[in-house]
Amino acid sequence: MIEIDGSYGEGGGQVVRTAVALSAVTGKDVKVTNIRKNRPNPGLKQQHLKALETAARICEARVSGLFPGSSELFFSPVEIKGGKYEVDIGTAGSITLLLQSLMPALPFAKEKVKLTIKGGTDVAWSPTIDYLQHVTLRALEQLGYAGIVTLKKRGYYPRGGGEVSAVFEPCKLRSFHFRRVKENRRTGEARREEETRNEGRNQNQRIEIQGISHASNLPAHVPARQAEAAESLLLEAGYGSRTKIQSFELLSTGSGITLWSGYCGGSALGKKGLPAEKVGRRAAEEIILELSSKAPVDVHLADQLIPYMALAGNSSYTVRELTLHAATNIWVTEQFLDVKFRIEEKEGLFEVSVD
């Protein structure tokens, strides 16, 4: 049995998500203690419980410690099976974080897994659904990952009501290397995309950033102003952009914007009292920071790629900063798999690799 101290490093829900996913893949029992110990509301929350319940259903696991506020979890998987599953997180629990708990395990399922999930699609402290679709899954395609996530309806805090459908096929993960083009080691589509992006940094107007600006129960000018502010700042930095505008009438009032280019993204959520222009600029500033660093992946994707790297083997990427989230994910992954990550600083960036 693997024992994981849930307070290690970043000490948040990601420790549990990665531990459970890798437990399912390896078939090793896991006990996680001190879950979210240093958080204002420690222990498991509703969205964690739903993720764990779903993981247990998919891999026929025995589980103990599944209750709100639980600081300890035992998870004993049997086999990752396929099938159809419906999950209602309740309120605005993050759909993307629930998927993060499952996705590393699903290539190893016996057959196709189909999910219908209700909850929050654009909520604080989690990737937006647009980021998952256009950055995370796009990068995972380079590993041979076979997954499609479809947005049916957005859900905002506090009532949620969003809906996403997802289909994941069993597949064999292949090694990947997301590096600067000057290292000249990449091949295929991913290399061509990186060449385009890196050449464009000398002439930023050649990089086109795409985005979606959206709002619910607000005047149509709100998502338009978010987009205009983002595009204006991007233009000042020399980047071309195209942003779709979406307006809805849903359960909760909310807004947000997600921008992406290659394997880098930027996003921001609106809130009461925060001008739409500030929301747009925050997303633009985030992606400009990533693109200007010349790193092929952004700091959030770098965190998410860790378990896939270990499962694929012989993989690497370069990122502008190694976050505590990523370092914690590395530690958890090394507890389950016979791998050792290496981190090297090169020309102001960090190369993370695993054999």
From Swiss-Prot:
**What positions does the entry give for ATP binding?**
Q100, H300, L301, A302, D303, Q304
Compartments reported by the entry: Cytoplasm
Chief location:
cytoplasm
Q: Which UniProt keywords apply?
A: ATP-binding, Cytoplasm, Ligase, Nucleotide-binding
Q: Which residues form the active site?
A: H325 (tele-amp-histidine intermediate)
* EC code: 6.5.1.4
Superkingdom as given in the UniProt entry = Archaea
Offer one example of a GO biological process linked to this entry.
Answer: RNA processing
Q: Which Pfam families match?
A: RTC, RTC_insert
Report the sequence similarity comment from the record: Belongs to the RNA 3'-terminal cyclase family. Type 1 subfamily.
Q: What does this protein do?
A: Catalyzes the conversion of 3'-phosphate to a 2',3'-cyclic phosphodiester at the end of RNA. The mechanism of action of the enzyme occurs in 3 steps: (A) adenylation of the enzyme by ATP; (B) transfer of adenylate to an RNA-N3'P to produce RNA-N3'PP5'A; (C) and attack of the adjacent 2'-hydroxyl on the 3'-phosphorus in the diester linkage to produce the cyclic end product. The biological role of this enzyme is unknown but it is likely to function in some aspects of cellular RNA processing.
Give the protein's recorded name: RNA 3'-terminal phosphate cyclase
Q: Which organism is it from?
A: Methanosarcina acetivorans (strain ATCC 35395 / DSM 2834 / JCM 12185 / C2A)
Lineage runs: Archaea, Methanobacteriati, Methanobacteriota, Stenosarchaea group, Methanomicrobia
